[in-house]
Structure formats: structure tokens, C-alpha cells
């Protein structure tokens, strides 16, 4: 990939595609992680004499501009984080008004444009929109790893029209995740959780031949347990994936580790009645909503001595405190490896768990890209990453 050092930015207007797709409630940004993650690239470019024009999407607006999807609240957060004024340009990124506002920027100045998904051509990678966006800068930097798997106008489209490079965040993400695919230090342990096998099939398929152990948790565990003939009560199961899970167990049974116990509930609610039962004997009318304490201990033990670890997806219904113990135990076990192992955590709930455990600093890499991380680990080429080559 082309790196920032290879790009001439002094006195230039640099269009930077960032990922500010952040949760906003009542006009207030709830989580600033993605804004903070973009700072090293922005500071690097400013220090080298660039003026910055920032592009991002927010949410999935369906009918053009909508107030709740405006990036205006993000401008205030960015201004505070950068320690310099950020000019918010409320007109559509493709408009003449925006072009005029951007042309007046001086080196060291920063402008944040309105949500690029307000443009109907963004997700279609419309050539006309690509041209209009390319006019806003002399060079282009892609730093939105979370959007790198999208062939959109502001991601891969503009890259074809301007001198370009990968930002520091994008570069670090690709390097960090590639280490999980190419010559990882062993033992290599992967923890996969979440509700559905179908969401993670390709990652499981691509990683299983490479790992020493794969620990399964979350709702998807019951599809595997059903494949082994277990009783799962009312637990979540994907019937159309049972045969596939059975095939994986036959082929990789020595590497796949399944829960031996589960926290079962009489209904899906935070205040449900609970009991710990064998994972393959969930009583009728009950549902498994977390891995049990015996499994949590076994998984922590399986992680001891690992040299490479990747964790994606919660072990249970992490939003309900009664079913968060499994996820928290895994967060603790991953963090305790410290610098004895190369550890990567990706996926919203796993990242939340590691942050809440107060142990995030002990993890080698926390990935900001949900779908993009998974697609890279599936062995797919990401349009944004390919465009930076």
C-alpha cells in the first residue's frame, strides 16, 4: 500500500476519508473512539503543511439529508480533540457552495463535510459524484478502515482520480490483521462468539486450517451442540447450518472447543430466572444465554501459553449483566496474556467488553472495523485497501 510518506502534501488540500460513523443521542456523540483513532493521521498531515477536507458517512440515511444523521455534533468533538478550529460545512459535499468553502482553506486549517451518504451516488460509486469529490482536494488519504470493504465513491472511487495513500489507521489495521493470516506465532488460539454461525462461516473456514484451537461461544454454540446431538431447549439454533457445523466437527474436531456448561434462562430478559446446566442438556422451555463457569475456566486455561490470539464476538447476551460473565472472563484471560502474546480483539461487543474490563491497554491491537475486519480475515480483497496499492 502507498504510505503517507510517499505523498506530497505540503501546501496541498488533502481529502481524507475518515470513519466518524459514531453513535449520537440527542445531538451528543456517545462514543468518541473513532474520532480519537483518526487523530494520528490528521496530526501527521497538518504537521506537514496540509489543509484538510474530511469526509465521512454516518448511519444509513435513506432519503437524502436528515438531521439525525448530520455530522455536525462530530465537528465539536473533533475540534476539542485536535485542539484547533474545525469548520463544519453543512451543504452537500458535491455542491458548488462546498467547493467554494473548501477552496478558501489555508494550510493548517480543517473542514469537516456533511454526511457523504446524503449523496444518492455515494453507495453506487457514481462517476459524477467521484469527479465532484475529487475536485475538493489535490490528494486523497483513506483512513476509514471500517468502510474499506465498501466500493463507494468516497472510498475507492476518489482514489482513482487523485494521488493517494493509506492513512496510519488503515495501514496499522491491515498490518495487524494480516499477522493473523500469515505465519502467526504458535500456539494460535481464536475465540469466536456472537449469535449466528452464518455471520462467521467464512472467517471460521479461513481460520480453522491455520489455528491450533478455536473456542466457540455465544448463540452460535448451540448450532454446534445440536450438530453433536445435544438437547438445546429453546436456545437459538440455525437449523440450516447444523449439517455444516457437523461437517466442521468431523473435519476439525480436535481443534474446535465447545462449551461444556451454559447459563440457562427461562425467558429472554435481564431479570429471567437462571441456572447453570450442561451445555448439551438445556431443559425444555429454557434457553442458554451464556457460557457457564466451567467453560469460562476451560477457555481461560486454553488461552494460557498462547502466542497469537484473535477474539471476535461475545460469549453470551452481554447486554444483560446476568449473562455477561462469560464474555468478561474471556476479556480478562486475553488481557492477562499481556506482552506474552500477540492479541487482537475485533467486533463491537468484544471491544466493549475489553474496554469495560479496564484492560484494553494490555491488548496488542483493538480493531475499529467490524465488517471490514471480518472480510479481511475471510481472505477477501477489500476495495478500499486495493485502491491504495
Curated annotation (Swiss-Prot):
ATP binds at residues 200, 288, 319, 347-350. The keyword Transport does not apply. Pathway: Carbohydrate degradation; glycolysis; pyruvate from D-glyceraldehyde 3-phosphate: step 2/5. One of its GO terms (molecular function) is phosphoglycerate kinase activity. PROSITE patterns: PGLYCERATE_KINASE. Its EC number is 2.7.2.3. SUPFAM superfamilies: Phosphoglycerate kinase (SSF53748). Substrate binds at residues 19-21, 34, 57-60, 117, 150. One of its GO terms (biological process) is glycolytic process. Its main location: cytoplasm. GO terms for cellular component: cytosol. It is found in: Cytoplasm. It catalyses: (2R)-3-phosphoglycerate + ATP = (2R)-3-phospho-glyceroyl phosphate + ADP. The keyword Cell membrane does not apply. Gene3D superfamilies: Phosphoglycerate kinase, N-terminal domain. Keywords: ATP-binding, Cytoplasm, Glycolysis, Kinase, Nucleotide-binding, Transferase. Monomer. Belongs to the phosphoglycerate kinase family. This is Phosphoglycerate kinase. It comes from Deinococcus geothermalis (strain DSM 11300 / CIP 105573 / AG-3a).
Amino acid at each position: 500500500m502507498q504510505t503517507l510518506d510517499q505523498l506530497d502534501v505540503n501546501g496541498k488540500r488533502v481529502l481524507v476519508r475518515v470513519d466518524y460513523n459514531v453513535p449520537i443521542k440527542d445531538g451528543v456523540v456517545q462514543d468518541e473512539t473513532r474520532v480519537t483513532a483518526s487523530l494520528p493521521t490528521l496530526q501527521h498531515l497538518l504537521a506537514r503543511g496540509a489543509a484538510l477536507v474530511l469526509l465521512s458517512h454516518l448511519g444509513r440515511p435513506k432519503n437524502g439529508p436528515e438531521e439525525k444523521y448530520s455530522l455536525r455534533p462530530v465537528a465539536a468533538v473533533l475540534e476539542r480533540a485536535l485542539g484547533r478550529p474545525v469548520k463544519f460545512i453543512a451543504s452537500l459535499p458535491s455542491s458548488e457552495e462546498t467547493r467554494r468553502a473548501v477552496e478558501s482553506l489555508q494550510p493548517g486549517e480543517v473542514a469537516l463535510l456533511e454526511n457523504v451518504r446524503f449523496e444518492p451516488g455515494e453507495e453506487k460509486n457514481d462517476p459524477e459524484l467521484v469527479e465532484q469529490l475529487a475536485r475538493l482536494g489535490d490528494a486523497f488519504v483513506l483512513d476509514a478502515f471500517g468502510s474499506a470493504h465498501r466500493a463507494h465513491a468516497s472510498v475507492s472511487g476518489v482514489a482513482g482520480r487523485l494521488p493517494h495513500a493509506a492513512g496510519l489507521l488503515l495501514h496499522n489495521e491491515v498490518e495487524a490483521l494480516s499477522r493473523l493470516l500469515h505465519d502467526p506465532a504458535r500456539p494460535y488460539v481464536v475465540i469466536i462468539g456472537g449469535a449466528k454461525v452464518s455471520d462467521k462461516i467464512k472467517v471460521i473456514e479461513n481460520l480453522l486450517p491455520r489455528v491450533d484451537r478455536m473456542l466457540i461461544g455465544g448463540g452460535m454454540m448451540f448450532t454446534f451442540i445440536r450438530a453433536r446431538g445435544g438437547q438445546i431447549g429453546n436456545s437459538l439454533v440455525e437449523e440450516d447450518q447444523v449439517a455444516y457445523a457437523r461437517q466442521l466437527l468431523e473435519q476439525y474436531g480436535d481443534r474446535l472447543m465447545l462449551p461444556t456448561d451454559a447459563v440457562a434462562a427461562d425467558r429472554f430478559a435481564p431479570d429471567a430466572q437462571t441456572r447453570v446446566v450442561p451445555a448439551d442438556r438445556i431443559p425444555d422451555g429454557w434457553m442458554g444465554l451464556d457460557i457457564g463457569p466451567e467453560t469460562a475456566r476451560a477457555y481461560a486455561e486454553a488461552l494460557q501459553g498462547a502466542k497469537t490470539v484473535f477474539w471476535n464476538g461475545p460469549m453470551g447476551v452481554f447486554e444483560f449483566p446476568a449473562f455477561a460473565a462469560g464474555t468478561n472472563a474471556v476479556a480478562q484471560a486475553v488481557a492477562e496474556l499481556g506482552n506474552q502474546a500477540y492479541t487482537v480483539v475485533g467486533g463491537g461487543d468484544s471491544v466493549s467488553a475489553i474496554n469495560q474490563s479496564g484492560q484494553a491497554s494490555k491488548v496488542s491491537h483493538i480493531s475499529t472495523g467490524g465488517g471490514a475486519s471480518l472480510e479481511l480475515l475471510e481472505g477477501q480483497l477489500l476495495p478500499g485497501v486495493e485502491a491504495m496499492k
